[in-house]
């Protein structure tokens, strides 16, 4: 244990990389990348197809000039002279869905503005490479304010910063939550019966369906994990049964209880990450009415109040950072700006646009357009802690890390072959695709999610463990064999906020996740009981056979007070931030948008992303965001109306 502990105390640092994202414009199938000077663009499409033969050089050059003329009306702005029916702020999960659905009507012009780069990294495609994505140039690298209740710690909050957003950087887990989650929203038109068909429409499930709960014709690929650790996964399942859990064959089937142990389905396609860029946006980039700009940071929504009412006219953005020229993208008559920047940056940008609590806006000299107290409030995330244990010496080499890497930190040839030839093996896994949902105190819905990892954390902060793993690999060090159980308060009671630090839209947001601030202490109790539950599982006959003591919390952490202190000092985000532009019924003063996702007090402005979720569903939030975007697209195109419910299944359990 001494060598393990010494490694666990080593400080990890993420690999250094160029953080300046290159600007990319995608329009009518053309891929345009910046060359020198910075404002001029040259097409890369021909370069991708191979070198142009010398005899065709002049015609290729003429074609390039024509491509540029089609995209640029002047030398400074890729959108000058254009008007759009829909401007999507952000190119993440929801925006990819909307861009696909809205641009299907060739008469509508759609613009997507993404602050980050294109989605071309190999690390995004390979699920196991998630260790390289946190705190990387593909992440916003956001940290909270010091949290007094968490031993004055800052919390790192991962958010994807590229086309596809967090669907390109998350753990790929596919969770809808339970039917009761949506019924608890209490918003007209968004009950479990209303939303189920939109989950099904989005999905092509390789292992379930088609049926009442799963689809076979949607863009989003979902499948069972293609890596199994036969010894450790089997031992965990047996151990969970020993402590009283029953198996759950499908956590997304609402006809039975959400609790139990089992396999978490993943958003993958034959073992490759199936992020929403690849599933929704990339296949339609050839549409001539769809334009996508990367490296385009929106700074505010342009809103006109001259006619006595607030009307969105377009957005202001920069393709050259805080010192760059502020450019404008304009709406066509009747067009709409749709905020898809996520639960952190959507409220952040709304406030910079004058939409938010008037006192805060006035503090920073921002003119108030719509005084909405709820903007940036109601932040909900699922806080987590973990237990970790090494395996006995005779089982060294049993972990997922051993199946991928050799003792020098090099990827095993067998792992590469399994991945490339069959889409199987350790490289297809983010490590946490088995687990459980548990009621710790008889709640109607499980309050605890357990992610079982057949690999050992060397940091009590689960996200820092991923970062540390990448450091170990780069230094050619062997990662010790063991297991981890990440314990998540999946239906938290605590809430936090997103605020401003200045009037500068390039300054980082003021983040406070608010973990463990609920007045009844329910979230802390859930995590404390989760630690006890995980220890019971580790002591079971099925799992104790493999384990050699406990690394975290450690043998010295015994009493509830000691466990609570451990939780406060190690609690971390499970990266499921929602709720900061809450959807609500008429008369709900805390809401920011109505049940059609329209921002109160501003015409031509909607929010379609995780911000609108009134109460976070149990489980990861990628699938619910896709559902919301699918439904929003249908509302915008007139293919659906609020109040028309999907056919209910025969039985819908809470």
From Swiss-Prot:
It comes from Chlorella variabilis. Catalyzes the decarboxylation of free fatty acids to n-alkanes or n-alkenes in response to blue light. Substrate preference is toward fatty acids with C16 or C17 chains. Converts n-octanoic acid (C8 chain) more efficiently than palmitate (n-hexadecanoic acid, C16 chain) into n-heptane (C7 chain) and n-pentadecane (C15 chain), respectively, partly due to an autocatalytic effect of its n-heptane product. Saturated fatty acids are converted to alkanes, not alkenes. The decarboxylation is initiated through electron abstraction from the fatty acid by the photo-excited FAD. The lineage of its organism: Eukaryota, Viridiplantae, Chlorophyta, core chlorophytes, Trebouxiophyceae. Keywords: Chloroplast, FAD, Flavoprotein, Lyase, Plastid, Transit peptide. It is an enzyme of class 4 (lyase). Hexadecanoate binds at residues 432, 451, 466, 486. Optimum pH is 8.5 (with palmitate as substrate). Optimum pH is 6.0 (with octanoate as substrate). It comes from the Eukaryota. The keyword Plastid applies. Its EC number is 4.1.1.106. SUPFAM superfamilies: FAD-linked reductases, C-terminal domain (SSF54373), FAD/NAD(P)-binding domain (SSF51905). May be used in light-driven, bio-based production of hydrocarbons. The oleaginous yeast Yarrowia lipolytica expressing FAP from Chlorella variabilis under blue light conditions produces odd-numbered alkanes and alkenes, which could be used as drop-in biofuel. Binds 1 FAD per subunit. Activated by blue light and repressed by red light. It is found in: Plastid, Chloroplast. Its cofactor is FAD. Its main location: plastid. This is Fatty acid photodecarboxylase, chloroplastic. Belongs to the GMC oxidoreductase family.
